[in-house]
């Protein structure tokens, strides 16, 4: 069932940590191209999806808000509603226009009275701590901006970052095994890097059969090379990776694009 739009917060402020957090001063990113769809909010599903009055269902590209049953699900939905309620909304597309559920997969903007963009909603949600950044190979526009804002929100303990449900995980295989089939952020030191039959394996322990591993397919190596990341020279590097945790000789995250890996100590060199 669709959640009714909350009325308890104004669209210009979000209740956060017992006080009000002003929305001014965000890192605004102008649309990559023309705004293509417009409308006003009808109802909110959760912190990363809603439906317009026209009936068009919208999924905010590049962020992952708490799901139903998780901590901060209702708070994230309220935050999204507060940002866009009563505002004219414009959608810009930076990758596929529809997801597998036929929702518009869009960068979402609130608009000024003259129709020009006012706020980039993804940026606001991440900055307030109500969305984790999630990039895909075909939707990685302005990811660095969002990742920087996520780091600030996480360090400040805003929103969902107060909950252990969304902690950055260490690469300990036993606890990570509890999060199989879920989106996680993992940070740790790469112990070794190896190529086997064209696959690249970044190992976070001494036993590849049980330890956490990041895997990159042969067909995706070129993307990392073009981004200046030498996968063969990763031993001893501290990295932060994000993606879906699976089991394959221990917990594994498969990466198919370089935007899903960060270097907390600085850019790769």
What feature does the model see in each segment?
Residues 2-9, 14-269:
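Small beta-barrel nucleic-acid-binding modules, primarily SNase/OB-fold domains
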